[in-house]
């Protein structure tokens, strides 16, 4: 059984075609995962716990009991209400910061939190617990929302 021999020219043509095809397919991929929560904080950063909340009349309400990921000062969580996601950090016994969870760099949902810093899994932007950019590539702060905490219920006003 004779196998046809491939010439050097044919081999090079096939190799160049394969590399070109791979490059084209790479360009069709997405840049991160805009506006949908990821499974990790990126770069080994621990993921935020997800807390489900309810939204009505321009307000999001979150129950914060002893079992909540937001029960202790210095904690943070990814709060989801319908199709909206918020980063919430507990900064004091009765004080919280709430901001959009959508990274200002390319629209990925920020899902990581480590050493008091929110981390975007797509390109590594870092934000303080007040939503300010700590480290790029993002250049704009996260949009903040007013909060009120009464009787173990956190209210975020949109």
Write out the residue ranges for each language-model feature.
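Short cysteine/histidine-rich metal-coordination sites, predominantly Zn2+-binding motifs
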Residues: 117-124, 134-142
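Disulfide-bonded cysteine motifs in exported proteins
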Residues: 23, 98, 115-117
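Extracellular secreted precursors and ectodomains with disulfide-bonded cysteine-rich loops/domains
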Residues: 26, 101, 106, 118-120
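Extracellular/periplasmic metallocenter environments
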Residues: 122-130, 155
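N-terminal pre-ligand scaffold of iron-sulfur
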Residues: 35-104, 109-113, 143-158
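N-terminal secretory signal peptides and thylakoid transit peptides that target proteins
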Residues: 1-34
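Cys/His-rich metal-chelating microdomains
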Residues: 31, 106-109, 125-126
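Short Cys/His-rich "knuckle" micro-motifs
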Residues: 111-114, 129-131
């Amino acid at each position: 059984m004779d196998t046809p021999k491939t010439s050097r020219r044919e081999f090079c043509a096939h190799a160049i075609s394969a590399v070109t095809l791979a490059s084209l397919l790479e360009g069709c991929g997405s840049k991160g995962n805009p506006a949908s929560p990821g499974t990790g904080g990126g770069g080994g950063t621990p993921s935020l716990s997800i807390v489900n909340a309810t939204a009505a009349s321009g307000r999001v309400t979150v129950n914060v009991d002893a079992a909540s990921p937001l029960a202790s000062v210095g904690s943070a969580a990814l709060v989801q209400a319908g199709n909206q996601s918020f980063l919430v950090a507990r900064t004091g016994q009765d004080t919280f910061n709430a901001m959009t969870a959508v990274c200002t760099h390319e629209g990925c949902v920020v899902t990581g939190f480590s050493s008091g810093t929110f981390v975007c899994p797509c390109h590594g932007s870092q934000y303080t617990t007040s939503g300010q950019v700590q480290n790029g590539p993002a250049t704009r702060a996260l949009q903040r929302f007013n909060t009120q905490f009464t009787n173990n219920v956190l209210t975020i006003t949109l």
